[in-house]
């Protein structure tokens, strides 16, 4: 897998990533995409999304602070993505607490398309119909059977599924990866998961093997976090160092430093 130039190909293309995301972390998602080498657009007006998706490289839908207006825009955007062959990444933030979000995901799967679902372990287990431990938008799950949950959900939606936690798990329904990089400090800043979803959209935009591209996105975030923590041990300075290290991350670094078990 070390010959997979996911980041290089992404930076050569400078993909336009259309984000319909939450109000808490919208700025973080835009900044990390810019640092990574992509071009973010935070467009969510119903009258604009269909046309804008048609010129985008990927669509990122984050359900964190889902309003009715965002819901209708997200569904329409997914229809445009299906019609224009634009990959879609879904982040089901808080779905165990708010069941309407599951209905939105199912609606998008029905009328649009889903290429990647990226959530924490609790969210992914919940969507897979398994017992999970969550508190609001946070997972309290220990990760047991997480890869199995990813595999089941990947088969259900015919997409890539990633579950994040102390270890991270990715599956396409047949193949999988387990990632053991990262730092606990990523849980001490708001929006690390949302930013990761944006990176997944960037790496999948122009890379055919989305299991590999999703694994590369997670490695990029986790290794940038590890390096950031080496220089910044407090949350405020860590957030800034994280963005800086995403800017400097490379394919060579993620595959050499990455602790990945391929399944």
UniProtKB/Swiss-Prot annotation:
Belongs to the Thz kinase family. InterPro entries: Hyethyz_kinase, Ribokinase-like. Catalyzes the phosphorylation of the hydroxyl group of 4-methyl-5-beta-hydroxyethylthiazole (THZ). One of its GO terms (biological process) is thiamine diphosphate biosynthetic process. Substrate binds at residues 42, 191. It is an enzyme of class 2 (transferase). Keywords: ATP-binding, Kinase, Magnesium, Metal-binding, Nucleotide-binding, Thiamine biosynthesis, Transferase. Pathway: Cofactor biosynthesis; thiamine diphosphate biosynthesis; 4-methyl-5-(2-phosphoethyl)-thiazole from 5-(2-hydroxyethyl)-4-methylthiazole: step 1/1. ATP binds at residues 118, 164. This is Hydroxyethylthiazole kinase 1. Its cofactor is Mg(2+). It catalyses: 5-(2-hydroxyethyl)-4-methylthiazole + ATP = 4-methyl-5-(2-phosphooxyethyl)-thiazole + ADP + H(+). The keyword Metal-binding applies. One of its GO terms (molecular function) is hydroxyethylthiazole kinase activity. Its EC number is 2.7.1.50.
């Amino acid at each position: 897998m070390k010959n997979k130039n996911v980041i290089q190909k992404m930076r050569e293309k400078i993909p336009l990533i259309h984000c319909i995301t939450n109000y808490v972390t919208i700025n973080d998602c835009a900044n990390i995409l810019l640092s990574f080498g992509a071009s973010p657009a935070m467009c969510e007006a119903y009258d604009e999304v269909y046309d804008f998706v048609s010129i985008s490289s990927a669509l990122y839908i984050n359900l964190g602070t889902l309003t009715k207006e965002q819901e209708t825009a997200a569904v329409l955007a997914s229809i445009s993505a299906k019609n224009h062959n634009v990959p879609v990444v879904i982040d089901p933030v808080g779905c165990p607490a708010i069941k309407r979000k599951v209905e939105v995901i199912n609606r998008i799967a029905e009328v649009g398309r889903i290429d990647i679902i990226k959530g924490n372990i609790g969210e992914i287990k919940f969507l897979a119909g398994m017992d999970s431990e969550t508190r609001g938008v946070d997972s309290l799950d220990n990760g047991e059977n997480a890869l199995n949950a990813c595999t089941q959900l990947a088969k259900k939606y015919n997409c890539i599924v990633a579950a994040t936690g102390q270890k991270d798990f990715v599956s396409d329904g047949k193949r999988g990866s387990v990632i053991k990089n990262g730092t606990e400090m990523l849980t001490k800043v708001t929006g690390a998961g949302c930013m990761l979803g944006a990176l997944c959209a960037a790496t999948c935009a122009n890379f055919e093997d989305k299991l590999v591209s999703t694994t590369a996105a997670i490695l990029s975030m986790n290794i940038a976090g590890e390096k950031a923590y080496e220089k910044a041990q407090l949350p405020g300075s860590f957030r800034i160092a994280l963005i800086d290290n995403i800017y400097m991350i490379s394919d060579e670094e993620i595959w050499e430093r990455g602790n990945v078990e391929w399944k």
